[in-house]
Every structure is written in structure tokens, then in C-alpha cells.
Amino acid sequence: MMDEVEGSEKIAITHSLGCMNWMLAAMTGQFEKPFDRVLFVAPPDPIKTNEAEGIQGEPMDLHHPEVLPAIRANTKSLTIIASDNDRWLPRGIRIYEEALQQQAVVLPSAGHFSLDDGWGEWRGLVNWVEFDKPGDLLTR
């Protein structure tokens, strides 16, 4: 479905488990054409997600040798935004920064970027989509 739209930029915005789902889809060849831009919002710690009810199997290994090449093959640009107090990321965003060789944008005290954390409309996200400036993501 993501390859059906013709025309302008192909952008994926993923949140939490959606980040891991996107990586898995990239690793298993689910995308026909690479994305122009991908945004990971509040990617979770794979170990923490495995503790959640209903999730089975081994935690995703961010350092698996197929992860980084799959991401690079399936997006021209990856942006990661995380918080310094996300309950689903207890080991911190550095686990993604190291594994994906990508510096994240960190928004202090943003929690898990969810309604429970006081999030609703996010002007910075709209700006990021329109203008492709990661710094815009810091604007609530």
C-alpha cells in the first residue's frame, strides 16, 4: 500500500511499536521503493516492549547485521525524535543512536509523545512534514 501513491514525497511517520514494525518491514523486503523520509517518534526499548502483555518472541536486536543496511536501503533520510523521560525507553535513546548511527532529536520531558503525556496537535510535526527541518520537531 505504501508503494501505491505516485507523485510527491513518500514519507513514513512511525510511533513506538510502529518504529519497530517499519524496521521489520524494511528487513523483510516489504517496500518496493525507498521512502524519501522516515520519522521514528518515541521508539521503544525492545527489551521493555517484550515485557508488555501480548508481545511474544525474542526482542528485536537493534545491532543485528541486517538492521542498518535495511534502513539505509529503504529510506533516503531517517529522523528520530525521543524524550529524556520515556517510560518505554528506560535505557535511553542512545541504544538507537548507536545501533542506527543516527543522532536523535531529544525533546525534554515529552514522555512517550502520547495523549496520556499531554500531547495533542503538534505543530512541529506538521512543519517537519512541510519543510524537512528536524529542529522544527522541538516545537509543540
Where are these regions (language model features)?
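Conserved alpha/beta-hydrolase "acid-adjacent" motif
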Residues: 86-92
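Conserved acidic catalytic loop of the alpha/beta-hydrolase fold
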Residues: 1-10
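Active-site nucleophile loop of the alpha/beta-hydrolase fold
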Residues: 38-48
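Catalytic histidine-centered segment of alpha/beta-hydrolase-like enzymes
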Residues: 110-121
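Short beta-strand/loop motif that positions the catalytic acidic residue
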Residues: 74, 79-82
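Gly/Ala-rich beta-loop-alpha elbow adjacent to hydrolase catalytic centers
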Residues: 13-23
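Residue in the alpha/beta-hydrolase core beta-strand immediately N-terminal to the catalytic nucleophile
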Residues: 10-15, 36-39
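Active-site nucleophile elbow and catalytic-triad environment of alpha/beta-hydrolase enzymes
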Residues: 52-70
